[in-house]
From Swiss-Prot:
The chain crosses the membrane at residues 4-24, 73-93, 106-126, 150-170, 175-195, 226-246, 256-276, 303-323. It catalyses: a ubiquinone + NADH + 5 H(+)(in) = a ubiquinol + NAD(+) + 4 H(+)(out). Keywords: Electron transport, Membrane, Mitochondrion, Mitochondrion inner membrane, NAD, Respiratory chain, Translocase, Transmembrane, Transmembrane helix, Transport, Ubiquinone. PANTHER family: NADH DEHYDROGENASE SUBUNIT 1, NADH-UBIQUINONE OXIDOREDUCTASE CHAIN 1. Coiled coil: none annotated. GO terms for molecular function: NADH dehydrogenase (ubiquinone) activity. Belongs to the complex I subunit 1 family. This is NADH-ubiquinone oxidoreductase chain 1. Its EC number is 7.1.1.2. Its main location: mitochondrion. Core subunit of the mitochondrial membrane respiratory chain NADH dehydrogenase (Complex I) that is believed to belong to the minimal assembly required for catalysis. Complex I functions in the transfer of electrons from NADH to the respiratory chain. The immediate electron acceptor for the enzyme is believed to be ubiquinone. It comes from the Eukaryota. It is a multi-pass membrane protein.
């Protein structure tokens, strides 16, 4: 019976995530449409609200094709792994009560999010296409490069709070958000999450003018839909993660259910809208600019912030002044 409740709890958490992903695709197309002085999808259902379901149905009833020279097992295993990792990480987020609560939950999130690199590289290599492989190599290099800055920023917050537990880090912001007291770190974090999720202006893995569609160029039907769903689930997840560690989670409604869940949802929605605004407003970076930004700008700043944090904590023996 306990296992049944655990499975039901997992499903009750994941179904809203999948619905949020479905409507995020619609919101993105609507936002981009209005920013470009057009309406966006408005035919399927009232105001185009049924468009995500029409798109999903179309993708999943299409024939699943595989290139004749592709690796048969890895080609289909990669999208499944990518999707599984995207959904697994949601269970560690302290929204009301985390489904999986560990003392080292922050390290687990960092480790599991790094595993998505293997799914991307596997899909690029298994397709046996030069465009797929170039896109996969770009994605891996980009993800690994920006994860270093993200890890150093997280290390600074770990030293401030003396904890690896996401719930504790969230509750430590009861009087002030880390986004206010560590504003430069929050800026670096936000831009790095754009690169980590392969979003514009860092979407070089899917540079249409160069490599068609990147690592998923040979995918069609269901496997392509899995990549698409996982990609958008990761966008919402990274913004939820940002809310938890920088924007105080459900504060000021910490103990008031369901207000605490609604507060987290509102903050996450605002950050997701920023992602969409950046996509509409900024052109794509060149690859050398992308690497210059992380290795010569963000990495030195992250290391400097870490050294400053260690110095302040050792000198004063207290947390950073939160104001």
């Amino acid at each position: 019976m306990t296992y049944l409740f655990t499975v039901l709890e997992l499903l009750s958490f994941l179904v809203p995530v999948l619905l949020a992903v479905a409507f995020l695709t619609l919101v993105e197309r609507k936002v981009l449409g209005y920013m470009q002085f057009r309406k966006g999808p408005n035919i399927v259902g009232p105001y185009g609200l049924l468009q995500p379901f029409a798109d999903g149905l179309k993708l999943f009833i299409k024939e699943t094709l595989k290139p004749s020279t592709a690796s048969p097992y890895l080609f289909f295993l990669s999208p499944l792994l990518f999707m599984a990792l995207a959904l697994l990480l949601w269970n560690l987020m302290p929204v009301h009560t985390p489904t999986l609560n560990f003392q080292l939950s922050l390290l687990l999130v960092l480790g599991l999010s790094s595993l998505s690199v293997y799914a991307i590289l596997g899909s690029g290599w298994a397709a046996n296409s030069k465009y797929s492989l170039i896109g996969a190599i770009r994605a891996v290099a980009q993800t690994i490069s920006y994860e270093i800055s993200l890890a150093l920023i997280l290390l600074s917050l770990i030293i401030i709070t003396s904890s690896f537990n996401l719930t504790y880090i969230m509750n430590a912001q009861e009087f002030s958000w880390f986004a206010l007291s560590c504003l430069p770190l929050f800026y670096i974090w936000f831009v790095s999450t754009l690169a980590e999720t392969n979003r514009a202006p860092f979407d070089l893995t899917e540079g249409e003018s160069e490599i068609v569609s990147g690592y998923n160029v040979e995918y069609a039907g269901g496997p392509f839909a899995l990549f698409f769903i996982a990609e958008y689930a990761n966008i919402i997840l990274m913004n939820l993660f940002s809310v938890v560690i920088f924007l105080g989670g459900p504060w000021p409604a910490n103990e008031l259910f369901p207000l605490n869940v609604l507060t987290i949802g509102l903050k996450t929605t605002l950050l997701v809208f920023l992602f969409l605004w950046v996509r509409a407003a900024y052109p794509r970076f060149r690859y050398d600019q992308l690497m210059f930004l992380t290795w010569k700008s963000y990495l030195p700043l992250s290391i400097g912030a870490l050294c400053a944090t260690i110095t302040i904590v050792l000198t004063l023996g207290i947390y950073l002044p939160l104001f």
